[in-house]
């Protein structure tokens, strides 16, 4: 999974916890 602070997409669930849709980071 992606480490916290990594850029992510709100539609993908590859973060360790969750993706922030506003900052687009885990």
Swiss-Prot record:
<keyword id="KW-0379">Hydroxylation</keyword>
<keyword id="KW-1218">Voltage-gated calcium channel impairing toxin</keyword>
<keyword id="KW-0638">Presynaptic neurotoxin</keyword>
<comment type="function">
    <text>Omega-conotoxins act at presynaptic membranes, they bind and block voltage-gated calcium channels (Cav).</text>
</comment>
<dbReference type="GO" id="GO:0044231">
    <property type="term" value="C:host cell presynaptic membrane"/>
</dbReference>
<feature type="modified residue" description="4-hydroxyproline">
    <location>
        <position position="21"/>
    </location>
</feature>
<protein>
    <recommendedName>
        <fullName>Omega-conotoxin TVIA</fullName>
    </recommendedName>
</protein>
<feature type="modified residue" description="4-hydroxyproline">
    <location>
        <position position="4"/>
    </location>
</feature>
<dbReference type="InterPro" id="IPR012321">
    <property type="entry name" value="Conotoxin_omega-typ_CS"/>
</dbReference>
<keyword id="KW-0108">Calcium channel impairing toxin</keyword>
<dbReference type="GO" id="GO:0005246">
    <property type="term" value="F:calcium channel regulator activity"/>
</dbReference>
<keyword id="KW-0800">Toxin</keyword>
<dbReference type="GO" id="GO:0090729">
    <property type="term" value="F:toxin activity"/>
</dbReference>
<dbReference type="GO" id="GO:0005576">
    <property type="term" value="C:extracellular region"/>
</dbReference>
<dbReference type="GO" id="GO:0008200">
    <property type="term" value="F:ion channel inhibitor activity"/>
</dbReference>
<feature type="disulfide bond">
    <location>
        <begin position="1"/>
        <end position="16"/>
    </location>
</feature>
<keyword id="KW-0872">Ion channel impairing toxin</keyword>
<comment type="similarity">
    <text>Belongs to the conotoxin O1 superfamily.</text>
</comment>
<keyword id="KW-1015">Disulfide bond</keyword>
<feature type="modified residue" description="4-hydroxyproline">
    <location>
        <position position="10"/>
    </location>
</feature>
<feature type="disulfide bond">
    <location>
        <begin position="8"/>
        <end position="19"/>
    </location>
</feature>
<feature type="disulfide bond">
    <location>
        <begin position="15"/>
        <end position="26"/>
    </location>
</feature>
<keyword id="KW-0528">Neurotoxin</keyword>
<keyword id="KW-0960">Knottin</keyword>
<keyword id="KW-0964">Secreted</keyword>
